[in-house]
């Protein structure tokens, strides 16, 4: 293969059969269970990178079911998102996500900088409640429940919340092990079509694990729970801060 061909074809590895396709990345009937809880502010300060700022000691614990996604297929994801501000702009910082499908793990890490790891999350309706779980190996590290569709939420308000900015810390090492990419990335969910939004009584239990440390941000109080279904496009990102250029 000629050098010019390598340059023109290079998108993702392997060169001749990339682990994920080019976008746009559209999700149909993407389903969220988001349980917001109050946690230890000191622990948040230890893990949220500057220049992001913590506004309140809150965490969104998310279980996300994605049965129909462009190029990524059928998978489920779970993890923690922390409400933050960047230059006065409110958004969410994704701390870690755990999922069961290789293409979105590879694409998420390489394109945007999503902190994704392989695990076994689930999200489904269990009789009268919606149930989310996360297993890392053989250990159950997260269990979330919410009463099924107890009360409608305002669709327009929830669409605005989904459309807000999200922040990622993208880290890619050089071949010698030093940092080659260390950037704060901002991205948005786009073309959102809300199909439903509900709330109800909720619970969240987190268990310690050395490699899936969701319990390092302890649950002190449940603040809010939301069950959302929407079609949306996962927009590509932009670098808002380059740690290596400072």
UniProtKB/Swiss-Prot annotation:
Alphabetically, the GO molecular function entries are:
acetoacetate decarboxylase activity
Q: Identify the Pfam families for this entry.
A: ADC
* Keyword hit for Lyase: yes
Enzyme class comes to: lyase
Q: Which residues form the active site?
A: 116
- Keywords, alphabetical: Decarboxylase, Lyase, Schiff base
Q: What's the EC number here?
A: 4.1.1.4
Catalysed reaction(s)? acetoacetate + H(+) = acetone + CO2
Keyword Lyase in the entry? The reply is yes
InterPro entries from the UniProt entry: Acetoacetate_decarboxylase (IPR010451), Acetoacetate_decarboxylase_bac (IPR023653), ADC_dom_sf (IPR023375)
What function does this protein fulfil?
Answer: Catalyzes the conversion of acetoacetate to acetone and carbon dioxide.
In the record, the note on similarity to other proteins reads: Belongs to the ADC family.
NCBIfam families assigned? PRK02265.1
Annotated protein name in UniProt: Acetoacetate decarboxylase
Organism of origin? Burkholderia ambifaria (strain MC40-6)
**Lineage in the entry?**
Bacteria, Pseudomonadati, Pseudomonadota, Betaproteobacteria, Burkholderiales
